[in-house]
Amino acid sequence: SDATQVKIEHTDKNGKKTVLKEGINLLSGEIIDAAVMSKKALREFFEREYNDAKENDILVSIHLKATMMKISDPIIFGHALSVFFDKVFEKYGDKLREVTYNPNNGLADLLNVRLNRLDKEDAEGVKKLIDECYAARPALGMVNSDKGITNLHYPNDIIVDASMPAVIRASGQFWGADGNTYDTKAIIPDRSYASI
């Protein structure tokens, strides 16, 4: 094919199109790979998979590559986190936005930085709802069981091409909060890696 230009458009829920980037040059014969993502479908997917893991009493672990996919994977990660801790965002979403919390940055940013910017009562309320979500949801896979760092603490802590081979070698298991391995539902929401 001939050299050409492409653009990236966003279509909102009302059908209004906004050009996000135009003038992307493609060389003759160059191949472009693109995808469309539905936020609603993604969030429904996470909810369904979390519920299934809870019903089957297995861990849940998220596997992405936010270090390389610097736009899409942190956003996907943010939705994984905000669905898991949905009660927190339902009650304190506006207050968390006021202290510039973005779930794409992980749970550690909330716990270690943003909570300090909330008043004491709200900070305690957020912590309480986090604990309620931990109790209501399936157990989360751990990056570091000794330090209490879950799979949702940092978007770049679970790199799919390192984490999934470890899960496969462990017969489909991942580390739990006590440092032992347990059967896990490995969620790979990025289609680039989902064929694993």
Tell where the protein language model's regions lie, with residue ranges.
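Extended, well-ordered protein cores
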Residues: 1-78, 87-196
